Amino acid sequence: MVHYKLSYFPIRGAGEVIRQIFVYAGQSFEDHRISIEEWAAVKPTTPFGQLPLLEVDGKVLPQSHSIARFLARQFGINGKCAWEEAQVNSIADQFKDYRNEVRPYVMVKMGFAEGDLDALSKDVFLPGFKKHYGFIYNFLKTAGSGYLVGDSLTFVDLLIAQHTADILSTDPALLEEFPQFKAHQEKVHSNANIKKWLETRPETQF
């Protein structure tokens, strides 16, 4: 039996979609959570000095979206054809662009940097959120299935549904402009495996 080990910090962050891919597929995995204190010693041993890392029978794969794409293909949630897979990957790449754009706000909010959180919210996060969620919303409306691509769940549905849930828990008014995202989040999180995971996973702020 293949042994999967996911190493990431004890937060949701970039590792959560990977955890949820395993959960959705019903695949057991080792959820290795590395504390900030442990990270200094671990960092030099990683390929790019970053987490998450996936180990598959001892072979190491870095980069969150590379891991997600690999597992999505393994478990059949990467799209039903090459075109759908390309669309799925484009949404994942766009979401990474969004995260990079709002990173200054997120770093201050998480306490990893200093800055004016209110100003960063107004000038960085809100414009970035509306722009990028608007792009992704177009995929949801075009698909017309309740999923982002095609007529079945793909890993980007897990990715976006988790972020939507995070937004709903902190500032639900942001989604008034994108009403179908709430229904999308509810649809994705109604899956029995995912629902159980959300109820039992470790509580983290981010």
Swiss-Prot record:
Enzyme class, UniProt record, top EC level: transferase
Family: Belongs to the GST superfamily. Sigma family.
Protein species of origin: Caenorhabditis elegans
Descriptive protein name: Probable glutathione S-transferase 8
Residues the entry annotates as binding glutathione: Y8, W39, K43, G49, Q50, L51, Q63, S64
GO biological processes: glutathione metabolic process
Keywords for the protein's UniProt record, in alphabetical order: Transferase
EC number: 2.5.1.18
Described purpose of this protein according to its UniProt entry: Conjugation of reduced glutathione to a wide number of exogenous and endogenous hydrophobic electrophiles.
Substrates-to-products reaction catalysed: RX + glutathione = an S-substituted glutathione + a halide anion + H(+)
Boundaries of every GST N-terminal domain copy: 2-79
